[in-house]
């Protein structure tokens, strides 16, 4: 309705309307992210942060990233469960249980459940005892790299 009203006014008067200035004290700026650089999962984060991070990089994006057995993989959706019996922090990322459809991943605050349909590439077949892991080098690079884009969508990296 707002767009219709604006278009009606524009076509009647030829004027774009009154500009509304942003108040600096109410403004925030967050730089754009690039999935190839910024989507690495930090397994030391709180379990709820890992869940929201993975789900934020889900479709239409190309998934949150981590490694298993030296292979980069992408996770599209994950669900966290906090429980009274917690795992030791050294167990974080370990696959402690599997079913036909789900992979159960240990975390110090509980566990995460990954549907096998949300793990790519499909050629990766995690086994019990395997660990999802992201190297500190990849995590540091994701924090230290700023991405900017040109108007035509090309990436400009800043470090």
What kind of feature is each model-predicted range?
Residues 1-81, 151-159:
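Active-site-proximal loop/hinge segments within enzyme catalytic domains
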């Amino acid at each position: 309705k707002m767009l219709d009203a604006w278009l009606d006014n524009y076509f009647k008067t030829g004027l774009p309307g009154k500009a509304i200035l942003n108040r600096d004290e109410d403004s925030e700026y967050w730089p754009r992210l690039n999935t190839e650089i910024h989507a690495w999962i930090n397994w030391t984060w709180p379990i709820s942060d890992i869940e929201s991070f993975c789900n934020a990089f889900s479709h239409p994006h190309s998934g949150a990233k981590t490694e298993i057995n030296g292979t980069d993989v992408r996770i599209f959706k994950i669900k966290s469960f906090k429980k009274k019996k917690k795992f030791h922090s050294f167990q974080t990322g370990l696959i402690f249980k599997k079913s036909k459809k789900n992979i159960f991943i240990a975390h110090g605050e509980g566990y995460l459940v990954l549907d096998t349909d949300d793990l790519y590439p499909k050629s990766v077949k995690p086994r019990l005892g395997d660990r999802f892991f992201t190297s500190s080098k990849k995590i540091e690079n994701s924090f230290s790299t700023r991405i900017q884009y040109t108007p035509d969508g090309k990436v400009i990296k800043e470090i």
